[in-house]
């Protein structure tokens, strides 16, 4: 600080300036804090179709109420989109992570169930061993989907059956409807088939 008068006036002037500077800094910190604490901008999310319809889409209006300055773009796809190429900020996936360079966090387990309609099993018989599936009508996702790997435990040893159905669909709900209508055997997440098992529509 410049000091052209007596020492007492110089100190008083210096203190006043210091207080103003500190006040300006406090205001700046408060402004930055308010921006930081209020998320804003564009959020691009991708998630599988069936999970999105049941567990994400119904809650988006609540999210918008909580964060009105966040613009949400939801890409619903059963394909594993490349996050970098598609400029995706957040991906929710029901599968094992294949790219270890991505930052991931497990949200929950996803138990799956192999199911068929009672009428189909009455007609074709119930498979006892994974090898029996080769003799059955399989409803699967399209080729290359990670959901086509059906995992079993046989004599305490893991066994994988790669599903390749004569009926291949790219949508979980479409597979579910085909299975309910006696189309064959499928494997879907329990959150998809649970209520149908409970009602006896699937077994």
Regions found by a protein language model. Give the residues of each.
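Central regulatory/effector-binding core of bacterial HTH transcription factors
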Residues: 40-103
């Amino acid at each position: 600080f410049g000091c052209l008068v007596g020492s007492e006036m110089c100190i008083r002037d210096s203190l006043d300036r210091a207080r103003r500077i500190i006040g300006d800094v406090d205001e700046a910190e408060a402004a930055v804090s308010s921006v930081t604490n209020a998320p804003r901008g564009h959020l691009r999310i991708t998630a599988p179709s069936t999970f999105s319809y049941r567990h994400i889409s119904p809650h988006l209006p609540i999210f918008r109420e909580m964060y009105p300055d966040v613009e949400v773009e939801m890409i619903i796809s059963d394909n594993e989109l490349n996050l970098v190429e598609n400029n995706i900020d957040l991906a929710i996936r029901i599968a094992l992570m294949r790219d270890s360079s991505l930052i991931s966090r497990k949200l929950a387990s996803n138990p799956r169930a192999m199911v068929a309609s009672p009428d189909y099993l009455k007609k074709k018989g119930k498979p006892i061993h994974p090898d029996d599936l080769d003799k059955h009508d399989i409803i699967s996702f399209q080729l290359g989907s990670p959901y086509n790997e059906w995992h079993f435990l046989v004599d305490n040893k893991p066994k994988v059956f790669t599903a390749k159905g004569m009926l291949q669909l790219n949508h979980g709900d479409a597979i579910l409807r085909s299975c309910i209508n006696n189309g064959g055997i499928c494997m879907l997440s329990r959150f998809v088939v649970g209520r149908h098992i409970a009602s006896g529509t699937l077994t």
